[in-house]
Amino acid sequence: MTSAAITPPTTVDRPMTDPFGRTIDYLRVSITDRCDFRCVYCMAEDMTFLPRADLLTLEELDRLCSAFIAKGVRKLRLTGGEPLVRRNMMSLVRSLSRHLKTGALDELTLTTNGSQLARFAAELADCGVRRVNVSLDTLDPDEFRRITRWGDLDRVLAGINAARAAGLAVKINSVVLKGSNEDEIPSLMRWAHGLGMGLTLIEVMPLGEIGEGRIDQYVPLSLIRARLSANYTLTDLPDSTGGPARYVRVEETGGRLGFITPLTHNFCESCNRVRITCTGTIHTCLGHEDASDLRRPLRASADDALLSAAIDQAIGSKPKGHDFIIDRRHNRPSVSRHMSVTGG
């Protein structure tokens, strides 16, 4: 894959703004729906993935990302599925890194389960990636196997060590699960902070059928925070990324702890992001079914005029907030698509 064939981004006249005055400068792109784990809160064990022919090519993903950068996106995150299982994905990372060199892009980053990180960490750093988010819900090998079904904890920990050795900043993302890892949060926090890594806790989200009810997995993070406050001093931080996390400093560890609470605390008022699936569908809200097709305008012309207009139309339809709810009366997915398709 070469960047020479890709149309370079033009100068940004003005940033993209949605109907509620929010600047859209963060793009999350799922480059594959495939994953080498089958986490119990994410997908069913017998998950059927998209035919490979349905996915955008790496060149198309590059052109799509570049079109958003030309329209004011400053932060780009590659997700999945597990992005590092897509063949030749590093050629996409290397090509997109040209936008870092020109200053058109502030940050190129990745969310991963860590299983392939030992193999790719050094190359990611060489491409200008400065930090990665690693999804890790437990440090107990048996519980890790139960949650991921197919995962190997030692391999993930080796990936985290390789990332740190390569100079990548690592943040741990943990989904809190009732009766599973909820009592392990303090030790997970001490471990992460002890290695200089941030930890962000995430409530279960009602996305896609998983073969069981999410109400049996759901723990409100307000409860977890109250438990932590009994033994730790949590000081609210003003840090804002335009995203869903609210941060505290844990005085006893010196580390930062984030809470993503779509169900107990709506996080939509400052949303600055949109998501693109590996098939070229744009979702302007994680918690809505509404979507727009960007693959057709992408393939309809060699220049980006049609694509740019389609992006503008999609941003113009971004809703004010999500519709997530979990309770006994609403124990079905609020959104039918899985996070592995949308991009986690």
Swiss-Prot record:
<keyword id="KW-0949">S-adenosyl-L-methionine</keyword>
<feature type="binding site">
    <location>
        <begin position="273"/>
        <end position="275"/>
    </location>
    <ligand>
        <name>GTP</name>
    </ligand>
</feature>
<dbReference type="Pfam" id="PF04055">
    <property type="entry name" value="Radical_SAM"/>
</dbReference>
<dbReference type="GO" id="GO:0046872">
    <property type="term" value="F:metal ion binding"/>
</dbReference>
<feature type="binding site">
    <location>
        <position position="271"/>
    </location>
    <ligand>
        <name>[4Fe-4S] cluster 2</name>
    </ligand>
</feature>
<keyword id="KW-0547">Nucleotide-binding</keyword>
<dbReference type="Pfam" id="PF13353">
    <property type="entry name" value="Fer4_12"/>
</dbReference>
<comment type="similarity">
    <text>Belongs to the radical SAM superfamily. MoaA family.</text>
</comment>
<feature type="domain" description="Radical SAM core">
    <location>
        <begin position="19"/>
        <end position="239"/>
    </location>
</feature>
<feature type="binding site">
    <location>
        <position position="28"/>
    </location>
    <ligand>
        <name>GTP</name>
    </ligand>
</feature>
<comment type="subunit">
    <text>Monomer and homodimer.</text>
</comment>
<feature type="binding site">
    <location>
        <position position="268"/>
    </location>
    <ligand>
        <name>[4Fe-4S] cluster 2</name>
    </ligand>
</feature>
<keyword id="KW-0342">GTP-binding</keyword>
<keyword id="KW-0479">Metal-binding</keyword>
<keyword id="KW-0408">Iron</keyword>
<keyword id="KW-0004">4Fe-4S</keyword>
<dbReference type="InterPro" id="IPR050105">
    <property type="entry name" value="MoCo_biosynth_MoaA/MoaC"/>
</dbReference>
<dbReference type="InterPro" id="IPR013785">
    <property type="entry name" value="Aldolase_TIM"/>
</dbReference>
<dbReference type="InterPro" id="IPR000385">
    <property type="entry name" value="MoaA_NifB_PqqE_Fe-S-bd_CS"/>
</dbReference>
<dbReference type="InterPro" id="IPR007197">
    <property type="entry name" value="rSAM"/>
</dbReference>
<feature type="binding site">
    <location>
        <position position="135"/>
    </location>
    <ligand>
        <name>S-adenosyl-L-methionine</name>
    </ligand>
</feature>
<keyword id="KW-0411">Iron-sulfur</keyword>
<feature type="binding site">
    <location>
        <position position="81"/>
    </location>
    <ligand>
        <name>S-adenosyl-L-methionine</name>
    </ligand>
</feature>
<feature type="binding site">
    <location>
        <position position="285"/>
    </location>
    <ligand>
        <name>[4Fe-4S] cluster 2</name>
    </ligand>
</feature>
<feature type="binding site">
    <location>
        <position position="77"/>
    </location>
    <ligand>
        <name>GTP</name>
    </ligand>
</feature>
<feature type="binding site">
    <location>
        <position position="205"/>
    </location>
    <ligand>
        <name>S-adenosyl-L-methionine</name>
    </ligand>
</feature>
<keyword id="KW-0456">Lyase</keyword>
<dbReference type="GO" id="GO:0061799">
    <property type="term" value="F:cyclic pyranopterin monophosphate synthase activity"/>
</dbReference>
<dbReference type="GO" id="GO:0061798">
    <property type="term" value="F:GTP 3',8'-cyclase activity"/>
</dbReference>
<keyword id="KW-0501">Molybdenum cofactor biosynthesis</keyword>
<feature type="binding site">
    <location>
        <position position="35"/>
    </location>
    <ligand>
        <name>[4Fe-4S] cluster 1</name>
    </ligand>
</feature>
<feature type="binding site">
    <location>
        <position position="171"/>
    </location>
    <ligand>
        <name>GTP</name>
    </ligand>
</feature>
<protein>
    <recommendedName>
        <fullName>GTP 3',8-cyclase</fullName>
        <ecNumber>4.1.99.22</ecNumber>
    </recommendedName>
</protein>
<dbReference type="GO" id="GO:0051539">
    <property type="term" value="F:4 iron, 4 sulfur cluster binding"/>
</dbReference>
<dbReference type="InterPro" id="IPR013483">
    <property type="entry name" value="MoaA"/>
</dbReference>
<dbReference type="InterPro" id="IPR010505">
    <property type="entry name" value="MoaA_twitch"/>
</dbReference>
<dbReference type="GO" id="GO:0006777">
    <property type="term" value="P:Mo-molybdopterin cofactor biosynthetic process"/>
</dbReference>
<dbReference type="GO" id="GO:0005525">
    <property type="term" value="F:GTP binding"/>
</dbReference>
<comment type="pathway">
    <text>Cofactor biosynthesis; molybdopterin biosynthesis.</text>
</comment>
<dbReference type="GO" id="GO:1904047">
    <property type="term" value="F:S-adenosyl-L-methionine binding"/>
</dbReference>
<feature type="binding site">
    <location>
        <position position="39"/>
    </location>
    <ligand>
        <name>[4Fe-4S] cluster 1</name>
    </ligand>
</feature>
<feature type="binding site">
    <location>
        <position position="111"/>
    </location>
    <ligand>
        <name>GTP</name>
    </ligand>
</feature>
